[in-house]
């Protein structure tokens, strides 16, 4: 069958119309865009602690730990005096002293062993002045080593207050002076423990004085006392701790 020119034009127009209609009926693809990157969130600063800030004065502060020999061969060892002259940190003291907070940091590498001038103030029967250099150096090496304080891994001992309550004596807490019992979170050699420490404080002329004297077991801090010769020579678990801290209000400091 022959198709004339008019029919050919009609057929071509129909095909073109069908093509246009089919393209209109297809859903249009909306180009997808990647979601915008999340805005970087800066870490929030720690909340301000209430009270007037006092900074520890290292040159006027001192921590002393008395460690005692034990075991069947105790007479072959020495009692040792460990000290820090490098205490750092701060106290924040509001009008209500019991709401005070503090943080004390002790750089482990600065701990000394058996300073003659400090031993001279102790009972000479328990702490004679003549400790051999080898014994002093060996004790410090063992103390800073991985089996005890692990100074290379954990360079600081950190003490943070958790709560403060009056000591169990009448009139223990005053605005200028008093005695309290502080519950402290201690971090020693990476181990976190909670201990209670009696503190006597005095506030005068922009200066805070805090002192204490107490027995404390190494195991309370998560430490294992040093032992040698299969336990024949040991360091006793119980130590004696004394501290005297001076902190002062910095220039321009104001209650927060």
Where are these regions (language model features)?
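A composition/secondary-structure signal for short, hydrophobic, low-basic-content segments
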Residues: 6, 22-24
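Bacterial N-terminal signal peptides
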Residues: 12-22
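Low-complexity, acidic/polar, glycine-enriched regions of mature
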Residues: 24-256
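Bacterial N-terminal signal peptides that target proteins for export
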Residues: 2-13
């Amino acid at each position: 069958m022959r198709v004339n020119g008019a029919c050919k034009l009609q057929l071509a127009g129909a095909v073109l119309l069908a093509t246009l209609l089919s393209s209109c009926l297809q859903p249009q693809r909306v180009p997808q865009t990647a979601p915008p990157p999340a805005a970087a969130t800066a870490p929030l600063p720690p909340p301000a602690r209430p009270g007037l800030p006092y900074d520890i004065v290292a040159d006027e502060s001192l921590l002393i730990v008395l460690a005692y020999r034990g075991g069947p061969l105790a007479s072959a060892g020495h009692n040792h005096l460990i000290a820090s002259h490098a205490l750092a940190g701060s106290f924040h003291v509001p009008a209500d002293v019991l709401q005070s907070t503090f943080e004390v940091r002790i750089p482990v590498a600065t701990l000394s062993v058996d300073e003659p001038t400090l031993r001279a103030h102790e009972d000479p029967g328990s702490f004679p002045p003549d400790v051999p250099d080898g014994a002093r150096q060996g004790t410090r090496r063992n103390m800073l080593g991985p089996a005890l304080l692990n100074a290379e891994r954990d360079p600081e001992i950190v003490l943070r207050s958790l709560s403060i309550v009056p000591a169990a004596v009448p009139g223990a807490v005053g605005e200028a002076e008093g005695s309290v019992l502080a519950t402290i979170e201690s971090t020693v050699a990476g181990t976190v423990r909670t201990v209670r420490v009696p503190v006597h404080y005095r506030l005068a002329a922009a200066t805070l004085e805090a002192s204490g004297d107490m027995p404390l077991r190494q195991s309370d801090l998560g430490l294992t006392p040093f032992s040698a010769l299969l336990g024949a020579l040991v360091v006793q678990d119980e130590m004696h701790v004394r501290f005297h801290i001076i902190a002062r209000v910095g220039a321009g400091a104001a209650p927060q």
